[in-house]
């Protein structure tokens, strides 16, 4: 997102992360003692710390026109993961997926500036992360889990792509990730279970790459092999 390039002068980080940071400092978590003083300082993390990160995994914008009314409809979708992991060895403990959608209407065709202005306004004024602590409190976050569940494989038949826009066939991994994220978010919400994130070609020892707003370093977050594997 171009919005992560827009730096807030007070915090020194992008505007989306700034909103998240302000929310994190006001969170009321039932079973987690959140250190709100050192949220961005890795050097202050004790060796046995469980770290929490909110990750923007994917975002997209789609548009269609109603030829009868000449009105353009737009949808901005953002897909996130709330990750809990052992900071000492960067191994995943739990993941909670969530997403949201912004719907737009316009008499003019959307361009990049219009979309960015609407998305920026949404992040700044509509408080998309306001219920983040309520979502986390639905789960019993533990350092270890006896059993884990996750999507390990997604198969899309060629005839399905024939019904999609041509460019989708060139982005099969993106489509698979969207399907996995959408399914995992609903599964997680309905059953209050944390999910092992989907990674294309999931295998034992697989890792998810993370880059934090306060560092240029890229971390490999080790993922557990799900005991209960979902094949879509």
Predicted regions and their residues:
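Charged/polar interaction segments and conserved charged motifs
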Residues: 1-31, 81-83, 94, 106-108, ...
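Low-complexity, intrinsically disordered or weakly predicted helical/coil tracts enriched
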Residues: 56, 64-73, 86, 91, ...
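Sequence-level detector for tyrosine residue identity
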Residues: 75-79, 85, 110, 123, ...
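Amphipathic beta-strand/beta-sheet edge segments enriched in Tyr/Trp
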Residues: 67-106, 229-232
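Charged, low-complexity, helix/coiled-coil-prone segments
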Residues: 54-70, 115-130
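N-terminal segment of the mature soluble domain
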Residues: 1-55, 162-232
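Elongated alpha-helical scaffolds
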Residues: 47-62, 71-84
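C-terminal/domain-edge helix-coil "capping" segments
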Residues: 87-163, 171, 175-185, 191
């Amino acid at each position: 997102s171009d919005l992560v390039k827009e730096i807030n002068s007070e915090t020194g980080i992008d505007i989306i992360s700034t909103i998240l940071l302000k929310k994190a400092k006001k969170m009321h978590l039932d079973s987690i003692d959140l250190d709100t003083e050192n949220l961005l300082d890795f050097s202050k993390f004790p060796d046995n710390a469980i770290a929490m990160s909110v990750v923007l995994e994917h975002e997209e914008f789609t548009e269609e026109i109603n030829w009868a009314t000449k009105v353009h409809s737009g949808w901005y979708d953002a897909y996130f993961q709330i990750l809990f992991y052992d900071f000492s060895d960067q191994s995943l403990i739990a993941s909670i997926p969530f997403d949201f959608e912004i719907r737009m209407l316009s008499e003019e065709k959307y361009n990049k500036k219009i979309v960015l202005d609407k998305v920026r306004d949404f992040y700044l004024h509509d408080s998309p992360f306001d219920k983040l602590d309520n979502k986390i409190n639905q789960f019993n976050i533990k350092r270890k889990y006896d059993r884990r569940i996750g999507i390990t494989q997604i198969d899309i038949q060629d005839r399905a792509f024939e019904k999609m826009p041509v460019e989708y066939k060139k982005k099969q991994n993106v489509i698979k990730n969207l399907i996995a994220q959408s399914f995992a978010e609903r599964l997680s919400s309905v059953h209050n279970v944390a999910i092992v994130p989907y990674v294309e070609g999931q295998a034992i020892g697989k890792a998810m790459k993370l880059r934090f707003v306060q560092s240029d370093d890229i971390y490999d977050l080790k993922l557990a092999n799900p005991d209960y594997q979902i094949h879509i």
